[in-house]
Structure formats: structure tokens, C-alpha cells
Amino acid sequence: SPEDDNYTEELMAVMASFREFGEALDAFIVDKGYKGDITDVKAKVAFIKSKFDQAGIQEYPRNMKKWFTDQVRIKDRQKDRRTIFQLCFAFELDVQESEAFCQKVCLQRGFDCHMIEEAVFYYAIKHHLSYNEAMDIIHQVPKPDQQPLDLKGDVLFTQTITKEIDRFQSS
């Protein structure tokens, strides 16, 4: 508690245990086959771009170099979270690996299936579809009604949504 004599030291020790985004991403890409010099930012960016190319993902994330040089993180905003899932598709992660990547590397929640785009990404990753196939599905989904949904007092948890998505079959 803040009243303890060594509270500041303990808090600093906890803070020191967190890795910068670039460090966490370094460990991730090494685990996924990067063999180059870990201090070579250009080579790391080229490795990530090669994964995007192999996956057929046309758009590269902005600020990739800054992930390693300026410790810029992927922000927790809907448009920026797409970058997280592009990385999941590029590195061919499964659902569990994608969840771990979100939480342990990006320090964000996993799939937010309350968002249509992320629900589709969950479905696509679960069924081993490509990023481009996921985007095709997203473009076909009707725009949601902006009216509040009456759940009759129930709470719609992400786990409930994913259980329903898990029932869908890929054709």
C-alpha cells in the first residue's frame, strides 16, 4: 500500500518487469524465425514486411521502424488494432497465439468480438482464412443499426460471442 515504507521501491520493481514494445516484438519475431542481428532495425522491418508479402497483405503498418527505435506502441484504437490482427495473419497465428500476442506483446486485450471487424478476424483466424478473405467478409457485412440493443438486462460477454462464432462453419 502507499503507506508502506518501501512502496516506491516495490512499485519501481514491478514497473521494471514490463518490457518495451520493441523488446517484446524482438522476442516475438525471433520466436517466429527471425535470424538476423537483433539490433538491425532495417532487417527486422524487412522481415515483418516479408511476412506481410507472403500472406498477401498489401498494406504495411505505419511506423514499423518506430516500434523499434522510439518505442511507439500500437494504440488501442479500432483503426490501430487492425494492425495487431494484420500481424496475427502475417505470422499465421492461431486464436490462442493471437490472444497471447495481443496481451503479452501489445499489452492489449485479445479479440473484442463486440466489434464486427474483430469478430470476423476471430472467425477467419479460427478457420485459417487469409487476411484478404477476412476483409472480403468484413466488406460484405451489413452496417449495424446504431440503435441500442436491448439485452433484457443480460450482459453480452466476449466469451458468449466467441462461443456463437465457434458454431459457424467455413465453406
What residue spans do the PLM features occupy?
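A generic alpha-helix surface/boundary motif
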Residues: 23, 46, 81-85, 118
